[in-house]
From Swiss-Prot:
Part of the 50S ribosomal subunit. It comes from Streptococcus pneumoniae serotype 4 (strain ATCC BAA-334 / TIGR4). It holds the Pfam family Ribosomal_L4. This is Large ribosomal subunit protein uL4. Belongs to the universal ribosomal protein uL4 family. The keyword Ribonucleoprotein applies. One of its GO terms (biological process) is translation. GO terms for cellular component: ribonucleoprotein complex; ribosome.
Length: 207
């Protein structure tokens, strides 16, 4: 079991928190992490590319000239692909680039990135992040007290709306919950700021 220092909002030590080795103490599997990150980045692609084929291009309903007797090549529409302004053949159509990996693979990737952050001392545990109202300045003070000045992913428990609203407008700060934090977000962050309640939820889901 790994022990990490537990801080309060003012940056003072509030004890120790014991992390489950099954979630935060495994040997990171870089291959699985890579596969999951590629999958999540693929899902972020918009895939809205499109062109018009001959049925979608405006016009071209009338045969441009009669079939025989003109000496010209036969044509059925001025929107055929060989015409300037005609439809595109086999062009791109809107599609989703996303694909799903097995749940076991996704969970192993999450455990791997969490374990890596703990091993690199980039995991900051805080007893709670409680605010009486959404105040960005107050959250900035919390980060300063905890000496966090780089890219950070804040992982909260469900329902902590004021903390989420206080943090989301700060530069280099991203907010997630224990159940929505992604492998991509965790790997992209320099530090993790995790509440004690969120740690319990992460262990409940992944252990």
């Amino acid at each position: 079991m790994a022990n990490v220092t537990l801080f309060d909002q003012t940056g003072k030590e509030a004890g120790q928190v014991v992390l489950s080795d099954a979630v935060f103490g495994i040997e990171p599997n870089e291959s699985v992490v890579f596969d999951v990150i590629i999958s999540q980045r693929a899902s972020l692609r918009q895939g809205t590319h499109a062109v018009k084929n001959r049925s979608a291009v405006s016009g071209g309903g009338r045969k441009p000239w009669r079939q025989k007797g003109t000496g010209r090549a036969r044509q059925g529409s001025i929107r055929s692909p060989q015409w300037r302004g005609g439809g595109v053949v086999f062009g791109p159509t809107p599609r989703s680039y996303g694909y799903k990996l097995p749940q076991k693979v996704r969970r192993l990737a999450l455990k791997s990135v969490y374990s890596e952050k703990v091993a690199e001392n980039k995991f900051v545990a805080v007893d709670a992040l409680s605010f009486t109202a959404p105040k960005t300045a107050e959250f900035a003070k919390v980060l300063a007290a905890l000496s966090i000045d780089s890219k950070v992913l804040v992982i909260l428990e469900e329902g902590n709306e004021f903390a989420a609203l206080s943090a989301r407008n700060l530069p280099n700060v991203k907010v997630a919950t224990a159940t929505t934090a992604s492998v991509l977000d965790i790997a992209n962050s320099d530090k993790l700021l995790v509440t004690q309640a969120a740690i319990s939820k992460i262990e409940e889901v992944l252990a």
